Regions:
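N-terminal targeting or regulatory segments adjacent to alpha/beta-hydrolase or S9 domains
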Residues: 1-50
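Glycine-centered tight beta-turn/hairpin loop motif at sheet-sheet or coil-to-beta transitions
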Residues: 60-62
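Short beta-strand element of the alpha/beta-hydrolase
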Residues: 66-71, 77-90, 109
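The serine-hydrolase catalytic nucleophile loop
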Residues: 89-103
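Cap/lid segment of the alpha/beta-hydrolase catalytic domain
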Residues: 99-154
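Alpha/beta-hydrolase fold nucleophile elbow
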Residues: 167-174
């Protein structure tokens, strides 16, 4: 058992791993500053202490990404912490009502539907073979720039930047 405590697998860790991700993050930062478009559509559920929005934004590669955004009412003069919540594999964001308790405690919540899974987000990637399962290996043959989850991670980062830039967000507590 001792030999497995430091086991690193049989695949070598890419020498340029950090450079690759730093370049990708820099591209997203530039996209955020110059091209990002997002849309918030208010939902009226009659909840006295919360505001609910459908939040759409253009993700990596032009995919339209959907998220549910719930914020406590009366946040104009306050800074609120945020939780970014994600669903399981082949899932979608949970129902609005299942998360209302979080917002009742003064915390904002955003739930992103991962592209290509069961939610409302769009997957505009072109992949050969199976698309219902196997997301983890989508794009492996084509190379790291085509990896499915690379774009998912970058969509997530982009969503975090959107949330971070709301005037009512406590940027230290996301």
């Amino acid at each position: 058992m001792e030999k497995y405590l430091n086991y690193k697998g049989i695949s070598p860790f890419p020498d340029d791993f950090d450079n690759f991700w730093n370049e990708e993050i820099n591209k997203v930062d530039e996209f955020f500053e110059k091209e990002l478009k997002y849309e918030m559509i208010k939902k009226d559920f009659g909840i006295p202490f919360a505001e609910c929005y459908d939040l759409y934004f253009n993700g990596i590669g032009g995919a339209r990404i959907y998220s549910k955004l719930i914020i406590p009412k009366g946040t104009k003069d306050k800074k609120i912490p945020f939780i970014l919540k994600f669903h399981g594999y082949q899932g979608q964001s949970s129902d609005w009502s299942r998360n209302i308790g979080i917002v009742a405690s003064g915390i904002g919540l955003v739930m992103m539907d991962v592209r290509g899974q069961a939610g409302k987000s769009q997957d505009n990637g072109v992949f050969d073979g199976i698309t219902v399962r196997g997301h983890i290996i989508k794009g492996v043959k084509e190379g790291r720039n085509k990896l499915f989850y690379k774009d998912v991670y970058l969509d997530t980062y982009l969503l975090s930047k959107i949330i971070e830039n709301f005037e009512f967000t406590d940027k230290e507590n996301i």
